[in-house]
A protein has these predicted regions:
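Extreme N-terminal starter segment of soluble prokaryotic enzymes
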Residues: 1-4
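Conserved N-terminal subdomain of the carbohydrate kinase-like
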Residues: 11-23, 38-119, 132-138, 287-301
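Alpha-helix C-terminal capping segments
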Residues: 32-42, 243-245
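Short beta-strand scaffold segments in enzyme catalytic cores
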Residues: 34, 80-83, 206-210
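Short, conserved phosphate/pyrophosphate- and ester-handling motifs at nucleotide-, phospho-/glycolipid
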Residues: 36, 170, 233
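A short acidic, amphipathic alpha-helical/loop segment
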Residues: 56, 127-134, 155-159
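Conserved phosphate/ATP/ADP-binding segment of small-molecule kinases
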Residues: 136-140, 147-217
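Conserved phosphate-binding/catalytic region of the ribokinase-like
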Residues: 183-301
Length: 301
């Protein structure tokens, strides 16, 4: 089944201890859409400006992602400039220029309204609601969020929870939204407010998944070098959702495997800047990384 991915597309400038790169393809929809395409057909909905480079668009086209929902608006594409500290866990935003993203309204085509799987990438809760208002009974809805929306749009975010099936957020965001310091209690608090499943990302410490059938935890893939963490969370969400779209059932078992697939793809994203590593991946690469991760989960299969 196909996945609708709605989110941001931007042009990034990234500084890390390993170097600086400019004019990179970025945005939640960019990473999530490409990751989901490894498991399912993807239809993208976002906005770019008249300055958006053709070579960035070609990255999606190579993966046969449907770009009919990519609006080209008059003006400049969303731009972000970020800097990572030495430990790569702390990031500082140097500048953000919303440009055409400031007026973005995700207008879905008739075909997009009927898609069974929806990934609401990192957008304002109002825009996430707008997407769901246009959908025709999707089978499974995944939503990602961030601390900014918890700070400035908490009520609208809480109103979104009953409308989705899976909420993805990191550990500090789960604590912030639930006011629970324990992640098990935080996930329970969140699930009581709507979503059947909650996936809590813990960075280099993996992911915790909670649902009505129980819980699952997966480690991160140990990496000797991380060049650029940008987009890792979006990649995780896209890989997970894409995997689910290829399954007959959506339950704890398939979501657990989805967590593994999302973790695998995210581990590649951080090995290079932007989508460079993800765009060059082969099925052989993914299979080898999957075996590596599964050995961590079950050392004696």
């Amino acid at each position: 089944m196909s996945v609708l991915v709605v989110g941001t597309v931007g042009i990034d400038r990234v500084e890390t201890p390993h170097g600086e790169r400019s004019d990179l393809l970025g945005g939640s929809a960019s990473f999530a859409g490409l990751a989901a395409s490894f498991h399912a057909p993807v239809s993208l909905n976002s906005v770019v400006g008249e300055d958006f480079p053709a070579h960035h668009r070609a990255i999606w086209e190579k993966r046969k992602i449907d770009l009919s929902g990519l609006q080209i608006a008059k003006g400049k594409t969303f731009r972000w400039h970020g800097q990572y500290e030495q430990n790569m866990n702390n990031r500082r935003t140097i500048s953000t220029d919303l440009n055409v993203l400031a007026d973005f309204q995700p207008l879905l085509s008739e075909s997009q309204k009927k898609l069974p799987f929806v990934l609401l990438g990192n957008l304002t809760p109002d825009l996430q609601h707008s997407v769901l208002d246009q959908m025709q009974k999707p089978k499974f809805v995944v939503a990602d969020t961030m601390n900014l929306w918890i700070d400035i749009a908490r009520t609208r975010l809480l109103e979104l929870l009953p409308r989705i099936d899976l909420l993805i957020l990191n550990d500090s965001e789960a604590t912030q939204l639930s006011d629970e310091s324990n992640l098990v209690r935080a996930a329970r608090w969140l699930r009581e407010r709507g979503p059947r499943y909650v996936a809590v990302k813990k960075g280099e410490h993996g992911c915790f998944l909670a649902g009505p059938e129980g819980a699952f935890a997966a480690p991160a893939v140990p990496l000797e070098q991380v060049l650029d963490p940008t987009g890792a969370g979006d990649t995780f969400a896209g890989g997970l959702t894409g995997y689910l779209a290829g399954q007959k059932e959506t339950n704890l078992s398939t979501l657990a495997q989805g967590v593994i697939e999302g973790t695998i793809l995210a581990s590649f994203t951080v090995e290079d800047f932007s989508l460079n590593r993800l765009a060059s991946l082969t099925e052989k690469d993914i299979a080898a990384r999957r075996r590596e991760l599964l050995r961590l989960i079950n050392p004696n299969p």
